[in-house]
Amino acid sequence: MTTDLSEDNTLTKPDGRNLRTDDSRKKIVSAFLQLIRQGTVAPSAEDIAKKANVGLRTVFRRFKEMELLYREMVIELENNFAPEVAKPWKTTDMESQLQELLERRSVMYEELMPYRVASNYHKYHSEFIQQAHAYWNVVVQKNLENILPFNKSSEPVLFNAIETALSFDTWLQL
């Protein structure tokens, strides 16, 4: 068990209730992500409680509404995949970088597919998911602009064609 030194320099022990709350919260988020990964686009609170091995009331106490679980999913995915998007290119020429971009995205898209399908299903009811998708679109667009010798403003048709070919939506159709 860990202990903290409080501001008045006395030794304090962590509160057991807070530890249980954090533990059950982590179990619920993990169960939610597992259910989506397994193909359940809209897991119910009952499914989550069963998978997390917690009571249904615990799910509702930790997450007053399901929207909060989708927020957790988005945050988790951003934390996992942002480093991959920000990783420097191994090569310097455009063709090789485009090939590397395609390889990275294909791996990422396969990992993201169940989560992205679930978030697409819920985005029309969630301002947060809509904002997260818009942010992600800007990130991947900037990623592509850093490779190409032109940008969306200078060559909109060509840029949009390449962007569409490399998009998650196109990958999903394959």
PLM regions and their residue ranges:
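Basic, helix-initiating cap at the start of DNA-binding domains
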Residues: 1-42, 46-51, 68
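Short linear capping/connector segments at secondary-structure termini
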Residues: 85-90, 119-127
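Solvent-exposed, amphipathic alpha-helical segments
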Residues: 27, 31-38, 84-88, 161, ...
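DNA-binding alpha-helical recognition surfaces that contact promoter or target DNA
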Residues: 30, 61, 71-72
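Short hydrophobic/aromatic patch on the recognition helix
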Residues: 54-63
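Amphipathic alpha-helical linker/stalk segments
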Residues: 11, 34-43, 50, 71-101
